[in-house]
Amino acid sequence: MAEANIRALADIIRRPIITEKATRLLENNQYTFEVDPRASKPEIKAAIEALFQVKVVGLSTQLPPRKARRVGRFAGHRAQVKRAVARLADGDSITLFPEV
């Protein structure tokens, strides 16, 4: 049963976001992830703490508007994405770039 719960939590966190701003936030022990748009803050916090074995002190989320896209004469939208910025407790860290 615990494995099913871990799998459900793993589906909440899609991928880490690596941008200039996200890299700057790493210096303040803040990590940025793309998450499921339907996930709530408690679910996101539980997923990060369970998957990475860290303590999340603060969590903020952003749900930016969808961008319109056009392919030829067909108009559409990009997929809805939600970003979460997690601030970790002092001494905790997540290895996003493993040593080669």
Swiss-Prot record:
Keyword RNA-binding applies: yes
Family statement drawn from the similarity comment of this UniProt entry: Belongs to the universal ribosomal protein uL23 family.
Protein name, entry field: Large ribosomal subunit protein uL23
GO-annotated biological processes: translation
Lineage, broadest ranks: Bacteria, Bacillati, Cyanobacteriota, Cyanophyceae, Synechococcales
Pfam families registered for this protein in UniProt: Ribosomal_L23
This protein's record includes keyword Ribosomal protein: yes
Organism: Synechococcus elongatus (strain ATCC 33912 / PCC 7942 / FACHB-805)
Gene Ontology cellular component terms for the protein in this record: ribonucleoprotein complex; ribosome
Record-level Gene Ontology MF annotations: rRNA binding; structural constituent of ribosome
Subunit structure: Part of the 50S ribosomal subunit. Contacts protein L29, and trigger factor when it is bound to the ribosome.
InterPro entries: Nucleotide-bd_a/b_plait_sf, Ribosomal_uL23-like, Ribosomal_uL23/eL15/eS24_sf
Known role: One of the early assembly proteins it binds 23S rRNA. One of the proteins that surrounds the polypeptide exit tunnel on the outside of the ribosome. Forms the main docking site for trigger factor binding to the ribosome.
Lineage: superkingdom: Bacteria
NCBIfam families: PRK05738.2-4, PRK05738.3-4
Record keywords: Ribonucleoprotein, Ribosomal protein, RNA-binding, rRNA-binding
